[in-house]
Amino acid sequence: MLKKLQIVSLAAAVFASPLALADEPALALTFKDPSLKWGPCPEFIPKGCEIAVVHGDPSKPNVDVFFKVPGGFAIPEHTHTSAERMVLVSGTLEVTYQGQASTRLKTGSYAYGPPKRPHKATCANGAPCVLFIAFEEPLDAMPAPGAVK
């Protein structure tokens, strides 16, 4: 009887954990969703850049954001503590990581940015560029050492 009780208790613990996760609601939206709260980017990035938190807390690990700049906008060289996993959802963006050739991202392109690797980008003239970015670590952005301000 005791053995059956232990097995039932173990099974209850194993199956209860996924139920706790089920309390978190699923989320689906686009960068045009009116519920998004767009705010300014860090001061070293010129005016016109906007960021909206999609999921998570920017001061904690695992935060997702939309990052938006107008067509023709140059994003200065900068770094992040975290790796970045990005999908371009609008526009055409040329990205250059220090020590690598430039890459032209088109809508739907995926890009990975290693942590602390200096990079810069330019949005092509025309449509705004909007990136979905998933950060592993808390959200930050700093001008790259020696970057033109």
Predicted segments, located by residue:
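Conserved short histidine dyad/triad with adjacent acidic residue
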Residues: 63-80, 114-116
